[in-house]
């Protein structure tokens, strides 16, 4: 079995994180989401992986290279062009269109392929899913999970018969129109014949175009409703909840890194905490090279990225700070994700640092205006 990771989208619903990162590169426990996918594929015997890329493609390619460090081979298919000014312009072909481009270029898909979205954490038993796919004689299989009816408008919904054969596929139907609450997880098993149905050179989507085509033609298209961990990072709220879940131990197979120095408090290498008047209530992770000044307060679940600096009197409450964030004296950050010059609350409302009370935070690498010890001053 080969694999295809879909990684060409812009991830607009996860801004500001995706202003500088493609969605598959958003970190969980300091590691990109896509890295967990690659490791999962390798554990299930998949050694050849193609990735379609477009928006900020170089971030993915530079991090993963050709995949040797993961014990796999990774190839890339760029979707876009360079304009007359020499600028790279992303131009995604849609989830199915990207697969077609790869097939026409080099014929990569010559056996069963598992297709996955690059922005979800999963622990699906791929070997079991493949066995069932082949047992049914399926041309295409979509892995589904039941979701609350009120959330069907956020997913592609699969309508199937008692044998699991897909009769209809609804792309994000309104609650009143949904005929099922079995949601597509963005994990698919395809035989090469499926790719023959995708038109050449067109933007073509799996959920809204390919799946309805398979169902309408009565082809052997099945769903498998399985119980497994599926964490879809579709929005900033999802991301916030994932990190909260990791820190509270609510997500299986994921442990907090670092060394536990107090009950529920983990720290990375070479981090300095002045405990004089400082209050830290776990679960809290403080990354490597951080500084926590005397009199600071940190209430978990909180994740503080490496190289960050929490000043005296500052309060960080149930928040996520990306690397090199300086929380200024006497400032409170409550239930926020802070990424460089932006913060986002749980509801997804974004604010620039210029809108924050008392300045809020700054770049911990910028020492301008920061009082330095006398021995650091050059005379």
Model-derived features with residue positions:
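N-terminal glycine-rich phosphate-binding loop and ensuing alpha1 helix
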Residues: 1-62
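Short internal beta-strands
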Residues: 50-54, 143-144, 337
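Conserved beta-loop-beta/alpha segment of the NTase-like Rossmann-fold superfamily
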Residues: 61, 69-161, 199
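Extended, small-residue-rich solenoid/repeat segments and analogous flexible loops
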Residues: 216-301
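Structural signal for terminal/edge beta-strands and the immediately following C-terminal loop/tail
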Residues: 351-379
């Amino acid at each position: 079995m080969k694999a295809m990771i879909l990684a060409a989208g812009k991830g607009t619903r996860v801004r500001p994180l995706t202003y500088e990162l493609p969605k598959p590169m958003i970190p969980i426990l300091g590691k990109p989401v896509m890295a967990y996918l690659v490791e999962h594929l390798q554990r299930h015997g998949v050694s050849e992986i193609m990735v379609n890329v477009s928006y900020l493609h170089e971030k993915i390619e530079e991090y993963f290279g050709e995949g040797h460090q993961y014990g796999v081979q990774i190839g890339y298919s760029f979707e876009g062009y360079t304009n007359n000014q020499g600028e790279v312009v992303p131009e995604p072909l849609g989830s199915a269109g990207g697969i077609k481009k790869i097939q026409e270029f080099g014929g990569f898909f010559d056996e069963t392929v598992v297709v996955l979205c690059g922005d979800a954490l999963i622990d699906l038993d791929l070997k079991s899913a493949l066995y069932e796919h082949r047992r049914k004689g399926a041309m295409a299989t979509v892995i589904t999970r039941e979701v609350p009816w009120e959330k069907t408008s956020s997913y592609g919904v699969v309508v199937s018969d008692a044998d699991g054969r897909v009769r209809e596929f609804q792309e994000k139907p309104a609650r009143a129109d949904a005929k099922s609450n079995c949601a597509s997880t963005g994990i698919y098993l395809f035989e090469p014949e499926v790719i023959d149905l995708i038109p050449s050179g067109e933007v073509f989507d799996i959920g809204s175009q390919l799946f309805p085509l398979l169902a309408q033609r009565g082809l052997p298209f099945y769903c498998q409703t399985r119980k497994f961990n599926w964490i879809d990072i579709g929005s900033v709220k999802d991301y916030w909840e994932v990190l909260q879940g990791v820190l509270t131990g609510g997500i299986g197979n994921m442990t907090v890194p670092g060394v536990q120095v107090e009950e529920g408090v983990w720290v990375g290498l070479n981090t300095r905490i002045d405990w004089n008047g400082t209050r830290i209530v776990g679960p809290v992770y403080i990354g490597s090279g951080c500084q926590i000044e005397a009199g600071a307060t940190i209430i978990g679940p909180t994740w503080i990225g490496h190289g960050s600096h929490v000043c005296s009197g500052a309060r960080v409450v149930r928040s996520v700070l990306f690397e090199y964030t300086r929380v200024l004296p006497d400032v409170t950050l409550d239930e926020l994700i802070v990424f460089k010059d932006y913060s986002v609350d749980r509801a997804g409302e974004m604010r620039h640092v210029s809108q924050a009370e008392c300045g809020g935070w700054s770049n911990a690498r910028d020492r301008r205006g920061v009082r330095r010890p006398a021995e650091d001053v050059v005379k």
